[in-house]
């Protein structure tokens, strides 16, 4: 499922392709690209839930705004998000790429993924997808994109 999300983000969203794509055509395109129908369905459902945030159909969790508060992760969240992932989320909060609401959206979308393995690189892409879809997060998206691509480009040299 995550591979389908990455393919969609890179092909349609990140490359600024036409956003109004018929779901049946999209499913055919993804099937032709070699993805399994179940993974396609799960990825599209995941994106629909993300779009609910964008359209205001789902309110993000209302949290205390005390800057000294610390997020305590559940056991299930700790299984999916290892220490490096949780540290990266905290880092993004500290540099104000994520706020309390977007952090919770990211965690919710990570937990909704149907994947056995999840790494820091995967988290970075989920964060990018969430920020891209949330109105008012354009600057945070740009910062995250710069962080993601500067680090990856630096590794090529």
UniProtKB/Swiss-Prot annotation:
* Signal peptide residue numbers: none
The cross-references to InterPro entries, in alphabetical order and at most eight, read: Smg (IPR007456)
Q: Which Pfam families match?
A: DUF494
Q: Which family does it belong to?
A: Belongs to the Smg family.
What protein is this chain from? Protein Smg
Q: Organism classification, top ranks?
A: Bacteria, Pseudomonadati, Pseudomonadota, Gammaproteobacteria, Enterobacterales
């Amino acid at each position: 499922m995550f591979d389908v999300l990455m393919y969609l983000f890179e092909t349609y969203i990140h490359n600024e392709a036409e956003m109004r794509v018929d779901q049946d055509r999209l499913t055919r395109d993804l099937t032709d690209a070699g993805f399994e129908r179940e993974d396609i369905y799960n990825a599209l459902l995941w994106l629909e839930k993300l779009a609910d945030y964008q359209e205001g159909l789902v309110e993000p969790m209302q949290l205390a705004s005390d800057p000294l508060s610390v997020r305590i992760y559940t056991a299930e969240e700790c299984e999916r998000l290892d220490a490096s992932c949780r540290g990266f989320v905290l880092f993004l909060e500290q540099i104000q790429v994520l706020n309390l609401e977007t952090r919770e959206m990211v965690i919710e979308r990570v937990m909704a993924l149907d994947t056995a393995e999840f790494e820091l690189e995967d988290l970075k892409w989920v964060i990018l997808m969430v920020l891209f879809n949330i109105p008012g997060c354009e600057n945070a998206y740009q910062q995250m994109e710069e962080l993601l691509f500067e680090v990856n480009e630096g590794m090529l040299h």
